[in-house]
């Protein structure tokens, strides 16, 4: 069976520093890049890559095995350090790209995101947008639970993340981040 390659970065490229917002070495050192397989919206199997904290690698492998088994479509999985994105969260969301580690702050705050520690993943941002009362990202994205690739409370993807101790941004009260799952920080990170 032919596999379509969405990302084939080497670890050095996937973990290169963002010159605009350098990551402390002790955080960068804990990140691992893993290959993941999934059906994309073309109905074919693709191979991508996700960078996450070493403590959550097994969780992400388990989730992507489930994604593949259930044919939950993923647009792409490409690290944000890839030249297509240059660490830009807006660009990766516009592309509908699934991503993990991104040393950055939470939108419109000065607090570090769980992505900054590699303990969060965004899945299909175009189907699962970030929505506040003032705006949504990516632009013109709609949350429609009937669309393929949309995460729903109680579905198998949600249930697996929840069983592994991850929190879903779709449950937040002040905003909805349907694409976002995060594993709470531990003292070790």
Regions found by a protein language model. Name each.
Residues 33-36, 63, 67, 101, ...:
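Generic structural hydrophobic/aromatic packing signal, biased to beta-strands
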Residues 105-112, 117-189:
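Catalytic cores and adjacent binding grooves of peptidoglycan-active enzymes
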Residues 17-25, 86-90, 108-112, 153-155:
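Intrinsically disordered, low-complexity boundary segments flanking structured domains
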Residues 24-28, 48-59, 111-115, 149-153:
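Extracytoplasmic/periplasmic, Sec-exported soluble proteins
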Residues 28-92:
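Active-site acidic/histidine clusters and adjacent loop/turn architecture
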Residues 26-31, 94-96, 114-116, 174:
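A generic structural signal for short, non-catalytic loop/turn and secondary-structure boundary residues
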Residues 1-46:
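N-terminal module-boundary/linker segments of secreted carbohydrate-active enzymes
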Residues 78-117, 128-130:
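Active-site-adjacent loop/helix surface patches within enzyme catalytic domains
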């Amino acid at each position: 069976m032919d596999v379509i390659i969405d990302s084939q970065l080497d670890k050095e490229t996937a973990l290169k520093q963002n010159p605009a917002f350098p990551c402390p070495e002790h955080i960068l050192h804990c990140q691992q890049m893993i290959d993941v397989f999934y059906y994309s919206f073309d109905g074919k199997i693709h191979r991508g890559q996700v960078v996450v904290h070493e403590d959550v690698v097994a969780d992400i492998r388990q989730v992507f095995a489930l994604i593949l088994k259930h044919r939950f479509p993923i647009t792409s999985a490409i690290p944000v350090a890839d030249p297509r994105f240059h660490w830009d969260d807006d660009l990766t969301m516009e592309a509908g790209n699934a991503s993990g580690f991104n040393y950055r702050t939470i939108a419109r705050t000065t607090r570090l995101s769980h992505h900054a520690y590699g303990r969060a993943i965004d899945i299909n941002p175009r189907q699962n947008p970030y929505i506040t009362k003032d705006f949504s990202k990516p632009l013109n994205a709609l949350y429609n639970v009937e669309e393929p690739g949309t995460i729903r409370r109680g579905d198998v993807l949600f249930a697996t993340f929840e069983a592994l101790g991850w929190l879903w941004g779709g449950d937040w009260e002040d905003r909805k981040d349907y694409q976002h799952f995060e594993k709470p920080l531990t003292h070790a990170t």
